[in-house]
Amino acid sequence: MNKKLLRIILTAILLAGAWLVEHYAGLAMWQVLLVYLIPYLLIGYDVLSEAVEGIMDLDPFDEDFLMALATIGALLIGFLPGAEPQFVEAVFVMLFFQLGELFEDYAEDKARDSITELMDIRPDTANIERNGRIEAVSPEEVSVGDIVTVKPGEKIPLDGTILEGTSSLNTVALTGESLPRDVQEGDAVISGCVNLSGVLRLRVDKSYSQSTAAKIIQLVEDAGNNKSRSESFIRRFARVYTPIVVISALALALIPPFFYDSYAPAFATWLYRALTFLVVSCPCALVISIPLTFFAGIGGASHKGILIKGGNYMDALARLKTIVFDKTGTLTHGTFEVEAVHPDNCSEQELLHLAAHVERYSSHPIALALRQAYPHEADNCSIEDVHETAGQGVSAMVNGRVVSVGNDKMMKTLGLSIPVCSRCKNHVGTIVHVAINGVYAGHILISDKLKADAREAISSLKTLGVTRTVMLTGDKKDAARQVAAETGVTDYHAELLPADKVARVEQLLSDKNENGTLAFVGDGINDAPVLARADVGIAMGALGSDAAIEAADVILMDDKPSKISLAIRLSRRTIFIAKENAWFAISIKVAVLLLATCGFASMGLAVFADVGVMVLAVLNAMRAR
């Protein structure tokens, strides 16, 4: 059983026993005090210890000091002339304060569940191959270059590359995406994913501390250090508020009795009101519930594949009015695909076959798109005399035929005219031309595909009150215009260098409303300067990207732009709950403070205004998970 809960139960029993002794044993008041000190010290020794430690450190003003002062005063007030003993209330107040602390601990544990569950992505062991045997060791003991084996049902222990095997990986703990990811030999995999089917042999590419799982866990744990404006204000407020409360309580106890005929009896009455005032004034509900709300909100977002580096970035997300998108890799997939094949005097299959073989050894993204469209490399074709002309294309001898694959410039160099193609009229991607033995043979259309949820993402942002969506790209104006039209962004700027993007963001920052914030959304790899300059830097598709995790303030672990609106909604909900708690706690406390000052509030009501309000506020904070 929880030690604090056991103390609460024993104290309640001893308190009942002390009450019976007080009423039926006929003891003197000082003897009754000694009886009540047993349950009081049992339940309050740690609070008293913290209060004394604060005094010794010359920093006494906290909730422990307020509770110690109020309850000690309640224990002693009965010895004043004309005062009623308040032994039961003194122990009762401390008992309920500890009950509130117990509930706070429980709520914090529940809020940490999101983080604890996130810890489940951390593998316990790695099966490393050593001297022809497999040994289970701690992931921290594995070095870069070691070979590890991952069986079905096990977690990927460290980031690496598959040497052997095919499988499906469950990435839900990292991305929030339930659809498994298929992997095969040569694919890069990251730690924290669960291997669902086949046995995999991996070459370790990163040490444990540099692997994705460890970095994500560290990021979420560190998020608590970046306080929101509300959290920072509450902490500053509490440091000023508590001394003012103590001084006000002293004034309430000492000054009003001067206006009575007899000071001593009046002092006992006003001292009780001052002690009640102290109990009500304890700022627990504010100091505990508001940071807990943000902690729960950050933990809940992490379960949806959204890593927010602190409450301050939740503040900024909630006030977004301008969002600037990079185009490639953010609104589009960032990978070229063959869209259509338009042959001239040959079949589509033959044209694609020849182009793919000519580009077999090129590392250009367009060459990769052609090879992916025709993956049958091992078809016994003879490829000789490969020659690449910078800025034009590639030529090679394929099965005895000279095949040239490139742009308009290459065709002009060959002295070939390019026929007008009516089907290419509205195409804004790349057109790759093919010539065979000096004769024009057709062209292949290649483009970067728009993400499926890009339009929905922009529409959702407008619904949430984002008034300006801007797209920046280094691509050509025609391509930018088409993506802007298809997604619905309000403005776009094309043919920009990285420095131009920073300048555009600077201009947008100077133009924005003071109450609104600006976010830049990119891939986190090539956009670090812009991500750093924006009020909020959002990196998309950051799974496995160290650069993205370091550069951004908010990290979307998959590549869905629609998750930006989800991040905004979660942030706004978290802040709304924090404000709810603040206003609820303040309004109840002000009401009971007035009642206490006028003599209409007992310590029992004061306990509710403190512990009861804290419990309700903490329960409300848990909604942010």
Language-model regions: role of each:
Residues V338-R468, K477, E486-V505:
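P-type ATPase nucleotide-binding
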Residues W19-E22, Y36-T125, E129, R133, ...:
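Actuator/coupling domain of P-type ATPases
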Residues M56, E63-A68, L174, Y272, ...:
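Conserved catalytic phosphorylation-site environment of P-type ATPases
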Residues G17-L27, E50-D59, G73-A83, G300, ...:
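Membrane-embedded alpha-helical bundles of multi-pass transporters
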Residues A12-I13, S232-D261, A274-F294, K579-F608:
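Bilayer-spanning, highly hydrophobic alpha-helical transmembrane segments
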Residues A51, Q86, A107, A126, ...:
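Residue-level signature of catalytic and energy-coupling elements of molecular machines
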